[in-house]
Amino acid sequence: TSLCAERQKYIVQNLETALYLTVNNPSGYADVTLXAFDFGXNQLFXLIP
């Protein structure tokens, strides 16, 4: 369970980073955000037994 929690925390931090970059670098927001969400989704699927 702790491993899952760590992964989920990492996903949240990754998405927060993407949001920060989106706000501070609007011209490149699409690629950064999509990559972050793709990474997050892959991590979430890894949590499914």
Curated annotation (Swiss-Prot):
Tissue: Stored in spherulous cells in the sponge tissue.
UniProt keywords, alphabetically: Lectin
TM region positions: none
A GO term for molecular function: carbohydrate binding
Subunit structure: Homodimer.
Functional note: Possesses D-galactose binding specificity.
Protein name, UniProt field: Lectin-2
